[in-house]
A protein has these predicted regions:
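Juxtamembrane helix-capping/reentrant segments at transmembrane boundaries
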Residues: 36-50, 105-118, 326
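Membrane-interfacial helix-loop-helix junctions in multi-pass membrane proteins
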Residues: 153-160, 328-333
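Flexible loop linkers connecting adjacent transmembrane helices
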Residues: 25-43, 100-108, 319
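Short, amphipathic alpha-helical segments
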Residues: 83, 104-115, 138-140, 161-164
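Alpha-helical transmembrane segments
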Residues: 1-27, 57-95, 99, 126-147, ...
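Short loop/hinge segments at the start of secondary-structure elements
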Residues: 93, 108, 117-129
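Membrane interface segments of multi-pass transport proteins and intramembrane proteases
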Residues: 101-111, 148-158
Length: 361
């Protein structure tokens, strides 16, 4: 537990003090956010607000995770390193995207194909990494089985190992792409993505720490409901560090935001959710835990699909939070209400995880 507390405090301290330093640097060099002309008109006043705040979130998380893991004697573990690779790798792609937007003063950053290629490369290396380097108990970071609160009977290796690995690569890429897009779309209002993420990673802190104390490697573990997740304590420390970094960043990102996380932060957060869902073997449960993110991305998919099919719009504007803006809701009202919904959903997801464990006792 001391490792989690240390990681949280260190990350929050680094983030809350490092963010204003980054703000001054970005303002000095006039690295501000470009605002789309076709968005809500009230967003035009945000033009020029410093972006790429995700840099501080990433750095604070990585440093605090390393210190927390060393304090707890939990790592750096192979699972933790894989999660950091996915987290930082997608953050770098986002940083390139943000940089191009700023330099060229347009809403389009990296070409979509370039961004997809980058995501595929990072996600594929992560996926392959989860299938190697078992620990002394024979536990791998990943599994070919589709998982809910633990691996299910449905496995991607049904037609042999070779095809199973190929399907696993595709499945992992789908998970990573879906979550990174979901968090990116949610990052549209001051403090929204950061606040929602705190609740999601709060739920995953509980899940990973519970997997630690109920690990099959623990003395006297019940084989009926213990967990074979590899390095759960290290993953819990990462979650605690990320929550601390987000809390510190939110101090400056709350409305009216003095800085945005940008694609740098949004893609990294999506990578963290995806990575945790795979490494904790909760791929489908993550849909519940991160249900607010899912609702936002579904609103965008529904809007586009219905408009292409019928020429009509379901929402006044997508993603979902912009719909409520055009209904006349204040930005702060939307953000706080979405936070409340995200908190309830995240707690429900953690509750489902615990209920599944209880059902096996």
């Amino acid at each position: 537990m001391i490792g989690l507390i240390a990681a949280f405090i260190i990350a929050m301290a680094l983030s809350v003090t490092g963010t204003p330093i980054l703000i001054r640097f970005l303002v000095m060099h006039q690295y501000g956010q470009f605002i789309r002309q076709d968005g809500p008109t009230q967003h035009l006043t945000k033009r020029g607000t410093p972006t790429m705040g995700g840099v501080v979130i990433i750095l604070a998380t990585v440093v605090a995770w390393l210190i927390g893991a060393l304090v707890a004697g939990a790592g750096p573990s192979w699972s933790g390193l894989l999660l950091i690779f996915l987290f930082v790798g997608l953050g770098v792609i986002g940083l390139l995207d943000d940089g191009i937007k700023i330099m060229r003063q347009r809403s389009l950053g990296l070409h979509p194909s370039g961004k997809i290629i980058g995501q595929i490369a990072v996600a594929s290396l992560f996926a392959l990494g989860t299938l190697i380097k078992p620990n002394e108990f024979g536990e791998y970071p990943g599994t070919l089985a589709i998982s809910f609160a633990r691996p299910t009977a449905l496995t991607l290796g049904f037609a042999g190992l070779g095809l199973g690995i190929a399907l696993y690569l595709i499945w992992t890429n789908l998970i990573v792409t879906a979550w990174s897009n979901a968090t990116n779309l949610t990052d549209g209002l001051d403090g929204l993505a950061a606040g929602v993420s705190i609740f999601v990673f709060g739920a995953y802190t509980f899940i990973t720490y519970f997997q630690r104390i109920q690990a099959c490697t623990q003395l006297g573990a019940n084989p009926a409901n213990c967990y074979s997740t590899r390095d759960p304590l290290d993953l819990a420390i990462f979650c605690a560090a990320l929550i601390g970094a987000l809390a510190g960043f939110l101090w400056w990102n709350a409305s009216p935001a003095q800085i945005f996380m940008g694609d740098t932060g949004a893609l990294a957060l999506g990578g963290a959710v995806a990575g945790l869902s795979i490494l904790t073997q909760t791929q489908l449960l993550a849909i519940v835990v991160g249900g607010l993110f899912v609702a936002v991305v579904l609103s965008d998919v529904i809007q586009i699909s219905v408009f292409k099919a019928t020429g009509k719009r379901v929402f006044r504007m997508a993603p979902l939070h912009h719909h409520f803006e055009l209904l006349g809701w204040k930005e702060v009202t939307i953000v706080i209400r979405f936070w409340l919904i995200a908190a309830i959903i995240a707690v429900a997801g953690a509750g489902l995880f615990y209920a599944e464990w209880v059902s096996r006792r």
